[in-house]
Amino acid sequence: MSKTPQSFLGIVSGGRRRTQAEVADRADRIASGLSRLGVRQGDCVCMLLRNDIAFLEAAYATMRLGAYGVPINWHFKPDEINYILKDTGTSVLIAHADMLHGLRDAIPAGVTVLGVPTPPEILKTYTIDRDHLATPDFAIDLEAWLGQHAPYDGPVVPQPMNMIYTSGTTGHPKGVRRDAPTPEQTAAAERMRAMIYGLKPGARAILPGPLYHSAPNSFGIRAGSSAARWC
């Protein structure tokens, strides 16, 4: 249970806290950077991240551009990751830095790789080679890159949901691009999900499930963007 004061509205991960305003600012800066990398409405941005504040920031940034965030199961083998990167046609991969060191040959040519520093709570939880914490030479450090971009000020466009690939147990993983909902559909869906998830202003949400799965992803995206504490 977090000991963060009840007045705090934002995301808590381990000992780190990030307010909603900070998350929104970082997401807008990521969106600006992605736009400069050529990401456009309807494109895919792949994310190879454990549960982390950066995951939600990347997801919100991608949605801001009207693009599809594609979470990749980080348990996948390099050839499975390679397949999804090729199948989506993505031009950008955002990943925890330590995961990238074994993927040099799995990342297609032309894909820009952004390395997210692996946070302390993840280092404490998982067995991670400390020699792999630095961003590899074929990737860009996301934190340094983030500081180069002003918040995105482009047009407001329909925002699609993240595209979740299947596990591929009966063949290759499969993903389906659903058209972005209309404003009316979005409003109706948000009312329904708020009721189902029990989200309301000031609520506290905890997310133990992996964000590469559809239900935790849907819940986490909404809890993180609502007036709630996300732990």
Residue positions per predicted region:
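Adenylate-forming
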Residues: 1, 23, 27, 34, ...
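Conserved AMP-binding A3 loop
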Residues: 19-21, 161-187
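Structural core segment of the AMP-binding/adenylate-forming
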Residues: 36-37, 64-145, 155-156
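Conserved pre-ATP/AMP-binding loop-to-beta segment of ANL
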Residues: 51, 133-165, 171-172, 197-204
